[in-house]
């Protein structure tokens, strides 16, 4: 049966609103643009800290660019939120853990493992620091598997005994809102998820698109 994760989130937010007191939330973020509309929406219900743990980002220059953009976004929006940086060790925390899945297509088992790595570490950190909830912004992307994300969140909620904020953040135009905020703030918005495999796939799609457009142009000129 298909689960409405947006509805599950709204039920949790309703309870928090009725309690009259904000809860503490540690939310995993992959980048500033993806977190923008999520934070805008959730700040009315939570005291939020951002956990920037992304060992899947292969290149250190890309990692630094996304981290700095995350911090800069909070400054521009004047959000009273802390960015907690996790350990950045792609070799041990990503490549070692996805061995054997290198040739998987984007959206498959390798991505599941990547979500698992990051959400699991977020749950662990949230438990250690006594947050009321943990979550991730990953479901803001139309390209991400919302079932994978929430199933993993539920798994670690049970393991660490801390509530997971279920979500399908792209719903109710929040993805479009994230794009709008990114443009308004002139934010750096990356063109691939983060790992070298997603970068290679993106470059391949671009080449195929360019070739199609070239062929279509030649047909029109005949």
Residue ranges and their predicted role:
Residues 1-222:
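Nucleotide-activated chemistry modules centered on ATP-dependent adenylation/adenylyltransferase
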């Amino acid at each position: 049966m298909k689960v409405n994760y947006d509805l599950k989130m709204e039920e949790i937010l309703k309870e928090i609103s009725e309690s009259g007191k904000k809860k503490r939330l540690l939310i995993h973020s992959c980048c500033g643009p993806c977190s923008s509309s999520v934070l805008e929406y959730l700040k009315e219900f939570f005291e939020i800290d951002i956990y920037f743990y992304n060992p899947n980002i292969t290149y250190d220059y890309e990692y630094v660019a996304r981290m700095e953009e995350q911090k800069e976004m909070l400054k521009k929006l004047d959000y009273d939120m802390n960015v907690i940086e996790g350990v950045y060790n792609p070799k041990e925390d990503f490549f070692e853990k996805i061995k054997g899945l290198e040739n998987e297509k984007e959206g498959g088992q390798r991505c599941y493992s990547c979500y698992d790595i990051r959400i699991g570490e977020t749950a662990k950190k949230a438990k250690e620091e006594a947050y009321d909830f943990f979550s991730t912004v990953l479901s803001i992307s139309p390209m991400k598997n919302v079932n994978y994300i929430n199933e993993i969140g539920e798994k670690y909620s049970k393991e660490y005994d801390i509530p997971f904020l279920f979500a399908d953040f792209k719903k109710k135009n929040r993805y479009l809102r994230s794009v709008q905020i990114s443009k308004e703030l002139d934010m750096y918005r990356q063109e691939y998820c983060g790992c070298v495999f997603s970068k290679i796939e993106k470059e391949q799609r671009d080449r195929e698109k360019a070739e199609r457009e070239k062929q279509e142009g030649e047909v029109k000129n005949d």
